[in-house]
Amino acid sequence: MGRSAKLLAVVLRSVDYGERDRVVTLFSRERGKLSAFARGARSSRRRFGGVLEPFTLLSAELTERGGDLWGLEDAAVERGFGNLRGDLARIACASYAVELTRELVRDAEPHEDLFDGLVAYLALLDEGPARPWDLRRFELDALRAAGLQPSLTGCARCGLPPGDGPARFDPLQGGVLCTACGSTGGVGARPISAAVLQALRSLQRGDGVEAGAGEGAEARAILGACIEIHLGKRLQSRRFLDEVGPMLS
């Protein structure tokens, strides 16, 4: 038998395996993302019950099976975030947050800041309605934790402050472009309004945001494009999130 470990983890995904078992993707504070084989999880309600549902915070006992796979020996719910599960908009946001986390990080690389940020965001959803700017904050925090933080205070190309003139955001170059460098933007570059740039800077500093629906839609599109450039694809949960967007408070 391999090494054993006791971890605090969020369930990112749970996939049925055969008629009796499941493979779960966990994001742990101590060891980062890992896959665990839950023997008998489907055939016995007594063994794991509802513990392995996505975006559940649990304490897990695991045994290394070899390669990148662990065996899940026992698990107990630390926080189930049950309140958010009765609201479609909050489910959509939580699903997006866990999929974004799963896609941004590599296996077995601890990201304590991202883990704490994910748990904090799930707690926000559990305690109140889904708010668009809370999700924008989580996106920025997730990008920062993964080493992909967009440049918002200095031009992504020349490093100088963007100034007060018209600015563009180029996800391929990694952030905002000043007026002088705006012409170097690629196909995905787009204008970014002063209000949205200020709002995103405030979120990046950890401050609050006062902005309207128009600014929110622009910020969503800009960060969405940034994430898609880094991942090379559009997340499945983002499509669901866009469908329920009008339901967000």
Feature names for model-found ranges:
Residues 1-249:
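Non-catalytic alpha-helical scaffolds and adjoining flexible linkers that form interface surfaces
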